[in-house]
């Protein structure tokens, strides 16, 4: 090997390996201190893109879980308020049955009516004041709202809430009252058939036909009607008037009353009534109130069932989102996170090489001095 002083190739080689070892040590320290093996695009351009997409998906899933939990909280708030609405309606029903009893005087019925009116006011207060995050839930203003329960746009679920005030259509129905009352000794004679034609809530045409027997009184006619169907309730009110009630939760059309017996009794046109209109100061009003409240309870129960299903659905959605998020983060970790066992081994190797290169470089720098000995 030639000896020269102008170019020290050995030192240059040692310097190059020393720089490589120093870079390796620096890179290992960066990865160990940051916890990531990809800290810039030069580390792994493709891996950086994939990990960033997975990070976006993971953050979207985290927000989706939060949104779903907010949706559950809203449903729980509304369902809790409707539970109290149910309790109020049950109490109003009890009072209506109490008022329908013949042992009550007019003053006693008036006292019962005062409590019914107070309960009605509280029912409306609950509907008007129940809110979540500034949004009213039960006064009809909530409408339909979407809940984003996915990591990407378009992955939303709709929630709707009905108006739970006592004057809404869902909390009422139509009342049909005979135009003329029957005397206490009235009974069925020749005309024995009565038909009720209507469309139910599912949109199917229905017809109920009863065939009374000669000698049956008005109470027995009402019993026949109630026994033949579950949609229209019959009762006998004041002054011997047969009255029918069709809840909007069960019947979606007007009720057409026909047949010979129906014509003989004679009914006025249907009148829209709601829980707000309950009047238990009369026997007829008390009887009608029971049927009316039964329809209102069905409306509340239907909404509560919908909210229960909504909560269960979101509970399953959260479980699925958590599972997806776990797998996404595991994939991102494999791509981006530092393997400390491997990296500490690599850093130790780089440090040893750095020390060796430093020693070799020091020796290589002494090579040109050999030329001096040749000069004597």
Swiss-Prot record:
GO MF terms, alphabetically ordered: structural molecule activity
The keyword Chloroplast is assigned to this record: no
Coiled-coil ranges per UniProt: 103-130
KW Secreted (keyword) present: yes
Cell compartments where the protein resides: Secreted; Bacterial flagellum
Entry's Gene Ontology cellular component terms: bacterial-type flagellum; extracellular region
Segments crossing the lipid bilayer: none
GO biological process annotation, one example: positive regulation of interleukin-8 production
Keywords attached to this entry: Bacterial flagellum, Coiled coil, Secreted
Cited InterPro entries: Flagellin (IPR001492), Flagellin_C (IPR046358), Flagellin_C_sub2 (IPR042187), Flagellin_hook_IN_motif (IPR010810), Flagellin_N (IPR001029)
Gene3D superfamilies according to UniProt: 3.30.70.2120, f41 fragment of flagellin, N-terminal domain, Flagellar export chaperone, C-terminal domain
Function: Flagellin is the subunit protein which polymerizes to form the filaments of bacterial flagella. FlaB is not essential for flagellar synthesis and motility.
Family in the record: Belongs to the bacterial flagellin family.
Assembly and interaction partners: Heteromer of multiple flagellin subunits including FlaA, FlaB, FlaC, FlaD and possibly FlaE.
Protein's name according to its UniProt entry: Flagellin B
